[in-house]
Amino acid sequence: MFDLVLRNGLVCDGTGAKAELGSVAVEGTRIAAVGRDLGPGRREIDASGLVIAPGFIDPHTHYDAQLTWDGLATPSLEHGVTTVIPGNCSLTLAPLRAEHREFLGAAFRQIEEMPKSAFDAGLRWTWQTFGEYRASIEPKLGINNAPLVGHSLLRLYVLGLASRDRASTPDETRALADCLRACLDEGALGMSTSFCDIDHEFRPVPCRLATMGELDALCTVLGERGRPLQVLPEFWDADLFCTRIDQMAELSIRHQIPITFSPLFESRAMPGLVGRVLERLSRQAARGARLQAQMQTRPIDMTFDLRGANAVFSSMPGWMGVLMSGPDATRKAFADPATRARLAAETDTAPMPLALVFSLEKTRLSAATGKASSEVGRSLGELAAERGIHPAEVLMD
C-alpha cells in the first residue's frame, strides 16, 4: 500500500512528453509509481480536473532572511515552486560572527530592497555557523530549501571587515577553503560569488576584493565535492560578460564543476547581448566546460524611495550627492529652484545603470504620506502633465 495516491489527474511529468490522464503514488518523500491502475493508498486525493506535475525549482532566490519567519517562501509556493535556492550573488546570512550582523543586515537590505522595519521585525539572529542557521529555519520549512553559501560571507567570517578592503593572504585563503568545506558539510549546496554587487555604502561587496587565485582555491573545494558555483557577472556589458564566461570556463574544466551565470536578459539597452553570450557558452561547452546561463523570464521591476542613495540613480552624480546628504539636506535641495532644474536635467541625459530601460514618466507612486497619499497608484508622467512640470520635479515634491 502506498502512503499517498493522487488519482485521475492530467499527469505532466516534466520531460516534455504528452500529458496523459493517470495517477501518481508516493511513499515517504519520493514518487513510487506513475500510471493508470495503481494500488491503494493510505491517503488518496481525487485529482480529477486537475494537473499533477512536478513543482518548479527556482534556482535564483534571496529568501535567506524571509525563511527565518516564513517557511513557505511566500508567494513562491503559491505559484507552484516547491524548491528554492537562496544564497545567490555571494550573499547569505551565514557563516556570520555576531559583530558583523549590523554590517551584513544593512548590505543585505540594500541589495535585496528589503525595508529595515520588516527585516528587523522578522529576523532573530541566533546563529554563527552555516549549520546553526540551517537548524534555526528547518523546523519552519514547508518548502524544499537548497541554499548556497555566499563567497562574501566566507570572506567576512575569515577576514572580518578587512574583507571589504583587500585580497586574502595565503593563510587566509586556506582558512577560506576550510570554512567552505565546513559549510558544505553543514548543508550548503554550493557557493555563489559576484563581480558587480555593491553594499549599502556603495562599496564593492567583499567577494569582489578576491583574487582569481582565491576563487580557484575555493573551486578546488567545490570540485572535491562535485558542487556548483553561481556567478553574478557584469550582465549589462557583453564584452565583460563574455570575459567572465572564459574565466569561469577555465575553472569549470580544471575542477570539473558546474557553473551557472545569472541573470541573462534581453534589453533594448543592450541589443545582441544574449546571442553573444549563448555563442560564447556553446564555444566553451565544446571544450568541456559545464556552463549554464539562467535566462530572465519576466521584466525586472525595481522599488525605490528617496530616503537614501539607491541603484536607480547610481549613474547620476548630482542625485547621488543629494540623496546621500541626509533627509534634511535632501529636502532643502529639492526645494531649491536651481537644484531642481539641475537634477531634472540630469535624469534626461544620464545613462541608466545595469542596462535598465527606465522611464520616470512611467514610474508609479506605490506609497506616500500626507497630501501625496491621494496620488498613490498614479504615474509621475500623469502628475507632471497636470502640473506642467518635469516628472523629476513631481518626484522631488
Question: Language-model segments: which ranges?
Answer:
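Acidic, glycine-rich active-site loops and adjacent beta-strand->loop/helix elements
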Residues: 62-65, 89-92, 235, 265-267
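Di-metal (Zn2+ and/or Mg2+/Mn2+) metal-binding site signature of metallo-dependent hydrolases
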Residues: 51-75
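Divalent-metal coordination cores built from histidine and acidic residues
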Residues: 69-190, 222-224
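Active-site neighborhood of phospho(di)ester-bond hydrolases with catalytic His/Asp-centered motifs
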Residues: 53-60, 85-88, 232, 262
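Divalent metal-coordination and catalytic microenvironments
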Residues: 9, 24, 29, 49, ...
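Short coil/turn connectors at secondary-structure junctions
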Residues: 1-2, 39-42, 48, 52-54, ...
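Histidine-rich, glycine-flanked metal-binding segment
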Residues: 2-4, 11-55, 70
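Active-site neighborhoods of metal-dependent hydrolases
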Residues: 133, 137, 141-142, 148-161, ...
